[in-house]
UniProtKB/Swiss-Prot annotation:
Disruption of the gene: reported phenotype: Large and misshapen chloroplasts with distorted and irregular outlines.
Top EC class of this enzyme: lyase
Protein name: Arogenate dehydratase/prephenate dehydratase 2, chloroplastic
Biased composition (Polar residues): 18-32
Residue ranges annotated for the Prephenate dehydratase domain, each copy included: 100-275
Domain of life: Eukaryota
Protein source organism: Arabidopsis thaliana (Mouse-ear cress)
Keywords associated with the record: Amino-acid biosynthesis, Aromatic amino acid biosynthesis, Chloroplast, Lyase, Phenylalanine biosynthesis, Plastid, Transit peptide
């Protein structure tokens, strides 16, 4: 099989994962050519045009003609992904052999397992940061991203809520993963030898009772599998990692204890992200995610939620985040935060009742965006 590499910046590595040092999307990188060994000339032309295309060229001229050329190439080529229907989404889940999926972390991360559940047989591509995974999809380095959004014990992943708004990706599905934490150490290290434990802050919090009983000093790192990798590579004999059983196998560590999480029903929900939305259907249970903002005033949030209650639409989640551009608003002698509201509700955008609810919400929302309408994951792994 021909090897392929992506040359966008010196720090960008395709097969070894994707670093956070990607060129900014609003700046044209030098020599931005994507080469696929032994690929067709049409495919080479496609990715060359993609790498060079920006909203405006260096002299400020409109690139609309160039954009039309790219659009035509997309339509003519069978090599590039097209907008997905819900049926195609199901097919891609059952046969994801050519799908490249970005996740945050290193090999053995729970996010890698979620990516493999969402797209079996996919090529899972590790990224250093959540931001990098979003940008990798936008810049065609990968086809999809699978990123955590909430945990049943630790709550919401606020960083990814902010990134959903900042980037122009669409939620095309969700996947729920049962998280089973293990305590990992090097072979020959007994539990009595341990003095400290390394892991992601949420993983440490989810194992609070066990770690307190063991009297271990907590040390936070970027991700669970990264902690396991550090224990193995640095040959630490006084430290353990909270990570997955899969991470133990990858890094050759001993499982000192299994299922150390405080709650056996420890579940993380991940979002499947793509460049194009799927076409919502009505043949199965769908969920829709939106974000909106409101003018301040008595009962305004009540009115916003009432548009769903009046139509018997069930809300499954509501999350508020301060509005970054206008964080504080003065009223009299007081200052208030302005908020964005992220809401998930059980309905497909193909349903007229959901469409009517959003039309109603638009009447008094100052901002409204549909993040995605996608099938609900009813399985657990």
């Amino acid at each position: 099989m021909a090897m392929h590499t992506v040359r966008l910046s010196p720090a960008t590595q395709l097969h070894g994962g994707i670093s956070s040092n990607l060129s900014p999307p609003n700046r044209k990188p030098n020599n931005s050519i994507v080469r696929y060994g032994c690929g067709s000339s049409k495919r080479f032309r496609i990715v060359t045009v993609l790498a060079s295309l920006r909203e405006n060229d260096a002299n400020g001229r409109d690139n609309s003609v160039r954009a039309m050329e790219v659009k035509k190439i997309f339509e003519d080529s069978p090599l590039l992904p097209k907008p997905l229907s819900s049926n195609q989404l199901t097919e891609s889940v059952s046969n994801g052999s050519r799908v490249r999926v970005a996740y945050q972390g290193v090999r053995g991360a729970y996010s890698e397992s979620a990516a493999e559940k969402a797209y079996p047989n996919c090529e899972a591509v590790p990224c250093e940061e959540f931001d990098t995974a979003f940008e990798a999809v936008e810049r065609w380095l990968v086809d999809r991203a699978v990123l955590p959004i909430e945990n049943s014990l630790g709550g919401s992943i606020h960083r990814n809520y902010d990134l959903l708004l900042r980037h122009n990706l669409h939620i095309v599905g969700e996947v729920k993963l049962a998280v089973r934490h293990c305590l990992l150490a090097n072979h020959g290290v007994n539990i009595e030898d341990l003095r400290r434990v390394l892991s992601h802050p949420q993983a440490l919090a989810q194992c609070e009772n066990t770690l307190t009983k063991l009297g271990l000093v907590r040390e936070a790192v970027d991700d669970t599998a990264g902690a396991a990798k550090q224990i193995a590579f640095e040959n630490l004999n006084d430290a353990a990692a909270v990570a997955s059983e899969k991470a133990a196998k990858i890094y050759g560590l001993n499982i000192v204890a299994k299922d150390i999480q405080d709650d056996c029903d420890n579940v993380t929900r991940f979002l499947m992200l793509a460049r194009e939305p799927i076409i919502p259907g009505t043949n199965r249970l769908f969920k829709t995610s939106i974000v909106f903002s409101l003018e301040e005033g008595p009962g305004v949030l009540f009115k916003a939620l009432a548009v769903f209650a009046l139509r018997q639409i069930n809300l499954t989640k509501i999350e508020s985040r301060p509005l970054r551009k206008h964080p504080l608003r003065a009223s009299g002698g007081l200052k208030y935060f302005d908020y964005l509201f992220y809401v998930d509700f059980e309905a497909s955008m193909a349903d007229e009742v959901a469409q009517n609810a959003l039309r109603h919400l638009e009447e008094f929302a100052t901002f409204l965006r549909v993040l995605g309408s996608y099938p609900v994951d009813t399985t657990m792994l």
